[in-house]
Amino acid sequence: MSTFAAPIYAEANREHLLAEFARLRTLLTGDQAPGAGPLPWDCDQPPAADILTAIFDLSPFERDLLLLCAAVEMEADLGELCGRLTGRPQRNSPTFGLALSLMPNPDWRALAPASPLRYFRLVELEPGFGLAAAPLRIDERILHFLAGSNRMDARLQSILRFEPPTAPLAEDHQELLDSLLRDCDARPETISLHLHGDDPAAQRAIAARIAQHFDRHLLILRAENAPAAGADLEQFLALWSREALLLPAFLLLDWHGDAPIANLRALAERIPTTLLIASRDAEKLHRLTWRHEVNCPDPTAQRRMWQSALAAVVPAKILESNAQLDTALDRMAEQFRMSADTIATVAAAVANEPDSLAERLWQNCRAVSRPQLDLLAERISPRAAWDDLVLPDAETAVLKMLVSQARNRMTVYEHWGFASRGRRGLGMSALFSGPSGTGKTLAAEVLAAELDLDLYRIDLSAVVSKFIGETEKNLKKVFDAAEQGGVVMLFDEAEALFGKRSEVRDSHDRYANIEVGYLLQRMEQFQGVAILTTNTKASLDKAFQRRLRFSVDFPYPGAAERERIWRRAIPSQTPSSGIDPARLAQLHMTGGNIRNIALNAAFLAAETGQPLSMSHLREAANLEAAKTERPIAATETRGWE
């Protein structure tokens, strides 16, 4: 980002730099004495050389030495002159010894390790020489600065990015910002701030506003890009220390990704400039950091944010005439957890579609919730409806109660005040238990379709790790990615994590219970719907089961249920002959098996060019039985000719 963009300034700075080079040439040649007075300057902003001198507090000799290194890069004859004077014409570089002998106010401290020229890497010494004889080169970043281009060092561009102070803030976050700015103004020399919580966008927006308050840019370093201890860290510290002064800028360490904490702590403890940290957890990296919590606004505040964002882009007449909008805003505020910036973006995206405003808002909210979770879980497109689900009436009633509560959370939790004492335990969590194929995943599809939400399947057996602490990290990744809340999460194979509790005999047992507790805690806090499935409910500890909001048993279907499943398994447009659902129901199979048999039988019929028949279904049933290693009794397929 350039701060010297004006053409008038650029030309004046070039002329000033050329005059400085001419002055240095007279010092090297001894043709005449340097001018006594300051060079003329008519711009409001000082020349780049003067800015650089002030930033790094350079002495007159250090300034001249730096300008000499710049001069040999920009004017070939000066490089040749230095080569002749040093007796090494092939190098065309100045040396410290040359500067000490020909320039006024010589000072050996100018190239001491702690001097600005060395500490901030403004100049580089060619290795293999003594201090006085070493050829000197100006760093490329500094050369461009002197020439009037203030752009971030190329070595930092791949790991740092600018964060403009343009994102809107929720009311609570604005109040926190105002308080932080008062504290910062009182102690500007000790700004070291850690913002933690579940709203990373708001944390970045607050940090950008703090930087703006002090006339600084904000640059973000993601935790996974943090340099490892050693040479990488040393180079980063040197380059960043310089960059923070040149741009100028504050650094925000974005600790929402994965990174070795040792690397982050080493960076936080050693960085010599203002440091801001953003993370989900409150674990401390730096002993001098002030810590403040920044979470997503509660549903009531989110509703106000939606109203404000829509009012800014949609005509009032359209908002007032949209009867569905109030209900939609209630559902969105309770279902999704979004930053003020995301809400403003979604509102702007639908502003030109007033006829379907409520529906477009909802679908856009779903879309922005997907990207991170798509990388970690399987997204299932829910197509099932209540008629596809064959369950006893009591179990169906529990599922419909879950849907009803999910739809009416805003009314009960916020309008009626049930969330006023805290939101712990208010998440929509459920346990689905029953043999494989009895409809647990199908029921999750029905719920997702009814709530108009995406369904994501997470295989807990793949999440669980034998390494201590890794399972919790894997679960954290999933829930953090789903934080915006607009999804139904289906955790399959709960028994992989939830065994019956036993006495804690070693660290593995203790960590297993910690991991179970962590999963339940995140489910209780989750803004969407979280479902655990298990084939063996008895293997789950009762204490864990009690923490789940709903529990639905999926029994093995009886004959009447199997007949209903068969009737649903074969589409009405399928050519068929002699299909008898009552006889088919004699076969003791689950709904999942029945659907597999119907599908395989249809392919058998299609291959022969005949309508689907009972014989096709018997052949497919034998294939399914062989796959599941379950023998079929003769009575089960009697009459399937």
Locations of the language-model features?
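Intrinsically disordered, low-complexity N-terminal extensions of AAA+/P-loop NTPases
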Residues: 1-313, 323, 331, 624, ...
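Short conserved motifs of the RecA-like P-loop NTPase core
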Residues: 320-336, 345-346, 380-384, 498-500, ...
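AAA+ ATPase "lid" subdomain C-terminal helix
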Residues: 74-75, 334-363, 367, 586-615, ...
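Walker A/P-loop NTP-binding motif of AAA+ ATPase domains
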Residues: 174-322, 396-400, 404-584
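Long, low-complexity segments enriched in small/aliphatic residues
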Residues: 371, 375-379, 391
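Dynamic helix-loop-helix/coil hinge segments at AAA+ ATPase domain boundaries and subdomain interfaces
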Residues: 161-178, 381-411, 588
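AAA+ P-loop ATPase central domain
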Residues: 360-363, 367-368, 372, 382-384, ...
